Structure formats: structure tokens, C-alpha cells
A protein has these predicted regions:
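Hydrophobic membrane-insertion alpha-helices, especially the h-region
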Residues: 9-22
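Functionally engaged cysteine thiol sites
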Residues: 6-9, 105-108, 173-175
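Short, Lys/Arg-rich N-terminal segment immediately upstream of the first membrane anchor
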Residues: 1-5
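Immediate post-signal-peptide N-terminus of mature secreted/exported proteins
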Residues: 30-114
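Hydrophobic face of amphipathic alpha-helices
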Residues: 29, 33-37, 45, 152, ...
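The feature captures two recurrent sequence modes
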Residues: 7, 26-30, 203
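Membrane-interface motif at the C-terminal end of an N-terminal transmembrane signal
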Residues: 19-33
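Compact alpha-helical subdomains of small soluble proteins
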Residues: 58-65, 73-77, 116-207
Length: 207
């Protein structure tokens, strides 16, 4: 089970949503326009594919997301804003796995509740910290989710197709793999392991 969980995790690249919601946060603060979110998402995809041409699209986007998020957190001088950026990145990671992915798999007639429940337990403390950081700038995860829900659905379609192709299974079987190994996958993908910079900023305020 451990090996399978790692194999799934290597392709899932849940971090693709980090910058989607980080960009969503910026767009909401600056322009409050859906068009800006879509343009940012398109750039993330283009840059990811350009810089990682031999990787599946979702994994290329994930690597680009991690790099950009780390750079932007390091460049932010104001701690409150830095925490809010980290929180928005965190909730991209969190919501794509607790809302968008379960919805996708339900459409495949697969219930991944075991994974979702384990994921929520693993991130209870971080979710509380992220909510506090967003509250400090007068927003919350539901506002962020509403802004980028369309983009998260696009990320999931690409992501799940990549999982299926990598493991030589159908998309429905990919959902079943996640459900069957929910505890293992959730434990392996704690925010501190997947995106240390976001975790560090959430918990200490430092980039």
C-alpha cells in the first residue's frame, strides 16, 4: 500500500492548485475579475509545460506552481500579506482535494470519502491557521473557491487523466485507487511535505 500511495502521489501533483488560488487571491484583491484568474491560469500552464516539457501537464503545472509560490512568498515584505498569500495557496491545495476532486470522482460513481476524511484530519491545524490569515484581510476560503471553482475543475480533469494514463487505468479506476489508499495518500501529502514554504509561512510568518 505504501508503494502504491507514493506512485499515485507522484502523479497527482495536487500542488497545481496552489498558484491557481494564489492568483485568485491577487485577482480578487486587485481587480475582482474572473478574466484575470483565467489569464493567470493559462500562463501557469504555459510556463509549466515550457519549463518541464517531458512531464505530464498536471505535474508540470505543479512544479511551476511550487516554484512561483515560493518565490512570491519570499519577495513579500509585509507579514500579514505574506500569511494571506500562503493561506490562499494552502486553500487551493485543500479545496481542490476536499471539494473538487470528490465531485469529479462522484461523477465517475466513486466515493473517495476515506481520502477526504483523512486529508481533513491531517490538516486540521493548518486549516485553522489559514482561515485566521484570510480573516485578517477580510476574505475567506469560500470567496476564493467561488472565484476559481471553474479553474479548479479544469485542473482536476487534467490531473485525473494524467493519473489514469500513468497507471494505465481508466479515470474511474484512478478514483478507486485514491479511495482504496486514502489514509496512505493523505499522510504522504501533508502540506509540510508538499509545499514547505507555504507551511512555514502559515505556521511562523517567515517565507
Amino acid at each position: 500500500m505504501q508503494g502504491l500511495g507514493k506512485k499515485v502521489l507522484s502523479v497527482l501533483v495536487f500542488v497545481a492548485a496552489f498558484v491557481v488560488v494564489k492568483y485568485g487571491f491577487d485577482a480578487y484583491q486587485r481587480y475582482k475579475t474572473q478574466a484575470n484568474v483565467e489569464a493567470s491560469m493559462a500562463k501557469l500552464k504555459a510556463d509549466g509545460v515550457k519549463n518541464n516539457p517531458n512531464l505530464p501537464v498536471s505535474e508540470a503545472m505543479g512544479r511551476e506552481a511550487v516554484a512561483k509560490t515560493s518565490e512570491q512568498l519570499s519577495a513579500e515584505g509585509d507579514e500579514k500579506t505574506r500569511r494571506a498569500r500562503a493561506a490562499s495557496s494552502y486553500f487551493g491545495f485543500y479545496l481542490v482535494n476536499t471539494r473538487t476532486r470528490p465531485e469529479f470522482c462522484r461523477q465517475q460513481n466513486v466515493d473517495i470519502t476515506p481520502f477526504v476524511s483523512a486529508f481533513e484530519r491531517e490538516h486540521k491545524a493548518e486549516s485553522a491557521q489559514a482561515r485566521a490569515a484570510l480573516a485578517a484581510v477580510d476574505t475567506d476560503e469560500n470567496q476564493l473557491f467561488g472565484l476559481v471553482e471553474k479553474q479548479l475543475k479544469q485542473v482536476i480533469v487534467q490531473d485525473m487523466n494524467d493519473i489514469a494514463a500513468s497507471n494505465k487505468v481508466s479515470v474511474r479506476e484512478a478514483c478507486q485507487m485514491i479511495a482504496s489508499n486514502g489514509e496512505t495518500v493523505a499522510a504522504e501529502m501533508h502540506i509540510s511535505k508538499v509545499q514547505p514554504a507555504v507551511y512555514r509561512t502559515l505556521t511562523t510568518g517567515r517565507p
